[in-house]
Regions:
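Interaction-mediating elements
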Residues: 1-60, 64-192
């Protein structure tokens, strides 16, 4: 396992978990991926890392299956490949899959994992980037705090960019009822 993967794992949320196995996925024409199978008590997760230590995804391993079939290379259309090369120069393609009629492409760009989604006719729909709360603009945080979800705990934050707008999707959970919601706020602080 490369030092960058080990360092990223040891600095991440799963550092205290036991590493049960490490798989190296070599795929023609796509990024090499390392899969760390980690466990704690009855929970198991597969953590997918790029060679340079970017955490690509965290997947609960409910069946103990380690075939990683969802990481098999998918052929991308020229339109999608050209768009990615133009909008994200130097991006490395990690994975691509068809889901609900859309094509979702996972890339690494500027040291971050991004998911780029294309719809009918390979039109770009949006790009999603996971971000830390500290990276969210103050105006967006203030909007969340003044909303009905202001006292709820924050589970996850994603930044979305589409052809016509940029917004944050903030997953929150009520500490009393454990109800969950996703709050969408434009980059200027407008609640959607």
């Amino acid at each position: 396992m490369p030092r960058a993967v080990r360092t990223a794992y040891e600095a991440g949320d799963y550092a205290a978990w036991h590493v049960d196995d490490v798989d190296k996925l070599l795929r023609n024409g796509q990024e090499t991926v390392y899969v760390l199978e980690v466990e704690r008590a009855e929970q198991e997760f597969d953590l997918y890392y790029s060679e340079d230590g970017v955490l690509l995804r965290e997947v609960p391993d409910r069946d103990g299956n380690d075939d990683h079939g969802d990481m098999l290379p998918q052929e991308l259309s020229k339109a999608i490949s050209d768009f990615i090369a133009r909008k994200y120069p130097g991006a490395r393609i990690v994975d691509a899959e068809r889901e609900k009629g859309n094509t979702e492409v996972d890339i690494i760009f500027a040291g971050k994992a991004l998911e780029v989604c294309f719809g009918t006719g390979d039109a770009w729909l949006w790009t999603k980037t996971g971000v830390r709360l500290s990276e969210v603009p103050d105006v967006v945080r203030r909007t969340l705090q003044s909303s009905q979800y202001g006292t709820w705990g924050i589970d996850d934050v994603d930044l979305y960019e589409s052809p016509d707008r940029v917004w944050y999707a903030i997953e929150v959970e009520d500490p009393q009822s454990e109800r969950e919601a996703t709050v969408r706020i434009l980059e200027d602080g407008t609640l959607l």
